[in-house]
């Protein structure tokens, strides 16, 4: 609550999951899949204790996915289907989840850096005109607030987008921010493709969720890709079973590390971009020479796609190799002094929400210079809102 007794709500609209709750809390009050489903055939009224409705959102949609045609309203951190996104927000603010009266609430929304302005403008319009929130703030780089750091590099990879954002003394350096539109959802798609090559067919919209769960359970990042490839070819060490919802059992071998490898080698899915290690190295090396060592010592991982076992050690190995080759030109004596620290907090899946909860709590009473009020929106329109956020409309 702020000093006027208004609730301060934080919503992290992820491409894969919505995390929502209150300012100053240590964990989201609700986490549910950002998906909307409609029944393929209206035959039954109930399945177990879930009533089948014309429109299903969130967990119920995920549980009954075999009977539904499923849509994901967001892609790469950008809302592609505003009607379906509206259903997700109705679910978020309605009696099923937060159960709030928006007119009495302040709302902090999150978004990935380098998102198009049009997406942000439409978000403001919907929140003020459709829901009537009292005041709103939209923030991009929130992870460091959760870690209590003022300087560092955030490597955030969720379901829709991966980005690397350096923050110095509390200011995000937008000119150095790097964005890669490869994240969890692309890994799931690639895993579906790899399984298809083995003869397992997952082409129904509901199978996507099944493969996502399989990916979370079994995939990992290879420390040494060549060694893992040899193991996959010559032994059964990597082979693991997975039971599908219909009871069938499938085996995964090399696919377990091949799917997430696209983070480091985007060319595997025909994307001509640098991989994660290259992007991070390029981002830090492009920063001011005085800040680089600070950045190397404070690399913070955030988002669900950074949860793969082996990711921090692989990132560290490749960063060190790049630094040795390109900066020190193979001088191993100087390399001894080079220090890297990659922080992988256990709660990093919800890091953006936690940072938002910290920021919203700090700023809850700063109406003049922080929150954009409904009155300001009505008087000055979207240009006024953007100006207050420090964004050129």
Curated annotation (Swiss-Prot):
SMART domains: ACTIN. One of its GO terms (biological process) is Arp2/3 complex-mediated actin nucleation. PROSITE patterns: ACTINS_2, ACTINS_ACT_LIKE. InterPro entries: Actin, Actin/actin-like_CS, Actin_CS, ATPase_NBD. The lineage of its organism: Eukaryota, Metazoa, Ecdysozoa, Nematoda, Chromadorea. It comes from Caenorhabditis briggsae. One of its GO terms (molecular function) is actin binding. It comes from the Eukaryota. This is Actin-related protein 2. The gene is arx-2.
């Amino acid at each position: 609550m702020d000093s006027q007794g208004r609730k301060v709500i934080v919503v992290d609209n992820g491409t894969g999951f919505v995390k929502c709750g209150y300012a100053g809390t240590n964990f989201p009050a609700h986490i549910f899949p950002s998906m909307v489903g409609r029944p393929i055939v209206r035959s039954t009224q109930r399945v177990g204790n879930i009533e089948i409705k014309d429109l299903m959102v969130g967990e119920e949609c995920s549980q009954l996915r075999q009977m539904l045609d499923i849509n994901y309203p967001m892609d790469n951190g950008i809302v592609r289907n505003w009607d379906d996104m509206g259903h997700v927000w109705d679910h978020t603010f309605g009696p099923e989840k937060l159960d709030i009266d928006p007119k009495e609430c302040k709302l902090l929304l999150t978004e990935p850096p380098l998102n198009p302005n049009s997406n942000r403008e439409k978000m403001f319009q919907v929140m003020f005109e459709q829901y009537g929130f009292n005041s709103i703030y939209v923030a991009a780089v929130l992870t460091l607030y959760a870690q209590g750091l003022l300087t560092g590099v955030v490597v955030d990879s969720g379901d829709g987008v991966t980005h690397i954002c350096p923050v110095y003394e509390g200011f995000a350096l937008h000119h150095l921010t790097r964005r890669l539109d490869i994240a969890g959802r692309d890994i799931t798609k690639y895993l579906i493709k790899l399984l298809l090559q083995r003869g397992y067919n997952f082409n129904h919209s509901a199978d996507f969720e099944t493969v996502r769960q399989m990916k979370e359970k079994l995939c990992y990042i290879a420390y040494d890709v060549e060694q893992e490839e040899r193991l996959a070819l010559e032994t059964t060490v990597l082979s693991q079973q997975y039971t599908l919802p219909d009871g069938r059992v499938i085996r995964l071998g090399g696919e377990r590390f091949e799917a997430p490898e696209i983070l480091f080698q985007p060319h595997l899915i025909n994307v001509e971009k640098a991989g994660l290690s290259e992007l991070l190295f390029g981002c830090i090396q492009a920063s001011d020479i005085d800040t680089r060592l600070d950045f190397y010592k404070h690399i913070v991982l955030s988002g669900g796609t950074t949860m793969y076992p082996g990711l921090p050690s692989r990132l560290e190995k490749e960063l060190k190799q790049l630094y040795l080759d390109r900066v020190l030109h193979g001088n191993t004596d100087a390399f001894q002094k080079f220090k890297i620290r990659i922080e992988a907090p256990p709660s990093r899946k919800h890091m953006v929400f936690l940072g938002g909860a910290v920021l919203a709590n700090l700023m809850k009473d700063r109406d003049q210079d922080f929150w954009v009020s409904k009155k300001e929106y009505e008087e000055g329109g979207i240009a006024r809102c953007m100006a207050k956020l420090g964004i050129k409309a």
